[in-house]
Amino acid sequence: MGTADERRFEVLRAIVADFVATHEPIGSKSLVERHNLGVSSATIRNDMAVLEAEGYIAQPHTSSGRVPTEKGYREFVDRLDDVKPLSMVERRAIQGFLESGVDLDDVLRRAVRLLAQLTRQVAVVQYPTLSTSKVRHLEVIALTPARLLMVVITDSGRVDQRIVELGDVIDDHQLSQLRELLGQALEGKKLAAASVAVADLAGQLSGAGGLGDAVGRSATVLLESLVEHTEERLLMGGTANLTRNAADFGGSLRSILEALEEQVVVLRLLAAQQEAGKVTVRIGHETEAEQIVGTSMVSTAYGSNDTVYGGMGVLGPTRMDYPGTIASVAAVALYIGEVLGAR
């Protein structure tokens, strides 16, 4: 790329940085004063004219300054040479804060609150998707000789507890057999495979009396846990940050809030995240969602040991601190995966 093109990109980068910081249209005079671009104000005006003609910046109303367009933000993001990671102190603080979570729900609540504070945007975290989860452990506890508590724990930290009402009482030996049979059928399998295995086990022992009946009743309850409750869940934090940036959205703030409440659009965008460590930036119309027009979404996947648990990210105006947001999203995702993977 030629020298003139490189210089124009430096002008574009300066316009993006100043507009994000000030929310005021940027003129050539302020660029000369704030940035060491090494050229005259007249040259910068010419460069801005070219950038405007090519669609990277625009003139709002009658202002003498210019603001970045979606195309301009995309060029800026695509040419980020290196996103500066958070400092060691910041990363240790994030890790310690997340490690203090007592369970999956607490870890994710902490993550979404932390990400909203770091970026000053709306933070969203998808609960671990059931399609990728495996059964880590099944515990069977006798509450009474005819009532059992089933506890299913997945590798992503989900814990589901179910009560099984037995037709007949079972003794300690039968309880031990039941625990072993169900554990062998379920543990280490993805939920879809585990549901098939437990159904097969129930079929094999159908009509076998006491233990067979207990397996059948347990299987019915476990299938509810493994299959029937697969709705996606989303945690959200920092929605008040939208009102702080209300001017950026024009008249679309209401539709954005409605989209966040309905969750469908955000879940679709997060579901596209299939690679932990890879941050995706969607700017404006790249979200392909009319309800959140005027926003950008920075998202990634989180997981552990090559297993993706779910997606997470932030939603905010196109006038966003992209380098800082990318670094924050990447760091929080990394530590969520580490914390959940260690449990």
Curated annotation (Swiss-Prot):
SUPFAM superfamilies given in the database record: GAF domain-like, Winged helix' DNA-binding domain
Classification via InterPro entries: GAF-like_dom_sf, HrcA, HrcA_C, WH-like_DNA-bd_sf, WH_DNA-bd_sf, WHTH_transcript_rep_HrcA_IDD
GO molecular function: DNA binding
Membrane-spanning parts: none
UniProt-listed GO biological process terms: negative regulation of DNA-templated transcription
Pfam families (UniProt xref): HrcA
Disulfide bonds: none
Keywords for this protein: Repressor, Stress response, Transcription, Transcription regulation
Family designation: Belongs to the HrcA family.
Biological function: Negative regulator of class I heat shock genes (grpE-dnaK-dnaJ and groELS operons). Prevents heat-shock induction of these operons.
Name of the molecule in the record: Heat-inducible transcription repressor HrcA
Organism expressing this protein natively: Mycobacterium marinum (strain ATCC BAA-535 / M)
Classification lineage: Bacteria, Bacillati, Actinomycetota, Actinomycetes, Mycobacteriales
